[in-house]
A protein has these predicted regions:
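Sec-exported extracytoplasmic/periplasmic mature domains
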Residues: 1-8, 21, 25-32, 103-113, ...
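Active-site-adjacent substrate-binding region
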Residues: 35, 162, 169-278
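Second-shell loop/turn segments in exported
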Residues: 1-14, 38-42, 83-95, 107-108, ...
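Extracytoplasmic/secreted proteins, especially bacterial periplasmic and envelope-associated proteins
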Residues: 11-26, 31, 96-103, 116, ...
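Structural recognition of the beta-strand scaffold that forms the well-ordered cores
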Residues: 32-33, 52-54, 62-67, 90, ...
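A non-catalytic alpha/beta surface segment that caps or lines the substrate-entry region
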Residues: 2-58
Length: 278
């Protein structure tokens, strides 16, 4: 968050992308930058950068772990309309995803695996049609970086056993329901992750309840790339937004990050990975 909002086509975005790539390299990953010009809902051409950090790139058995790293350009869900055109710092949505992936990468460097791991930081996830726009909402206006990667993977014919997407995994008060598309396309992976969380004592963060269907980066991973992928995403039953009180507001900052939530998600996902390595 020290770089400021990571809005595509800005200097803060460019600098932060370089920082993320260099951190993965420092943890021993092979880093691939996938640059793409993607078109936003309003015709703006976004200079997108998907950052792929791989371990054991020659291993056939692979697991995909992903999240997005860009910031929402507009705080269009803010309770104060004066903030609707201001960019979002996006500590939870989704610097939290990248922070957890970087910590996993650090652990993998210390405790090497035999299976292959690909961390993907997707760009241009959060440039969807804003609520103040005259245009109708369009699901395809979101997740532009993952749509591009799913159609043009960094390795020809790329496959993975399964994928785990993390989105907003650090917000205070977060719990994670079983998201709809995840259950449709990858119910066994949902069960694997939720059962692992329960075994680790994190069942309060991963309740055994169904959530709604969320347009997120796992949808193109499932539908275009054909990789069964789940989404770990919060579901608030008692907030104005199901994604929590800071979603797409100027208050999505470090003050509202809970280390216990980050720990619950990170330890659960890394345990799933090491269990698959056995």
């Amino acid at each position: 968050c020290a770089f400021g909002p990571r809005v595509p086509n800005t200097e803060a975005h460019r600098l932060c992308g370089t920082y993320i790539a260099e951190k993965f390299k420092s943890f021993g990953a092979t880093v691939t930058d996938q640059y793409a010009d993607v078109k936003a809902y309003d015709g703006t051409v976004l200079k997108a950068r998907n950052i792929i950090a791989s371990y054991n790139p020659d291993a056939k058995a692979r697991i995909l772990v992903c999240g997005h790293w860009d910031s929402r350009p507009w705080a269009d869900n803010d309770p104060d309309s004066a903030n609707w055109h201001k960019p979002v710092l996006a500590a939870n949505d989704a610097a939290s995803d990248v922070a957890v992936m970087l910590e996993m990468a650090r652990l993998i460097q210390l405790h090497p695996l035999e299976i292959g791991i690909d961390f993907i930081c997707f760009d241009a996830e959060d440039y969807g049609v804003p609520q103040w726009s005259d245009q109708a909402g369009d699901a395809s206006s979101w997740c532009l970086g993952s749509q591009y990667w799913a159609a043009n993977p960094h390795v020809y014919g790329y496959q993975a056993r399964f994928g785990i997407l993390m989105d907003m995994v650090g917000g205070r008060g977060s719990t994670f329901s079983k998201e709809g598309y995840s259950q449709r396309y990858a119910s066994q992976v949902v069960d694997l992750v939720w059962n692992t969380a329960a075994q680790l004592g994190y069942g309060q963060f991963f309740p055994m309840r169904d959530g709604g269907y969320i347009t997120d980066d796992h949808v193109p991973v499932n539908e275009i790339a054909g990789i069964p992928c789940i989404d770990i995403i919060p579901y608030f039953t008692d907030a104005p937004s199901g994604f929590g009180p800071t979603w797409h507001t100027v208050n999505d900052n470090m003050e509202h990050i809970d280390r216990q939530v980050l720990k619950a998600v990170g330890q659960t996902v890394i345990q799933v990975i090491y269990n698959e390595n056995q």
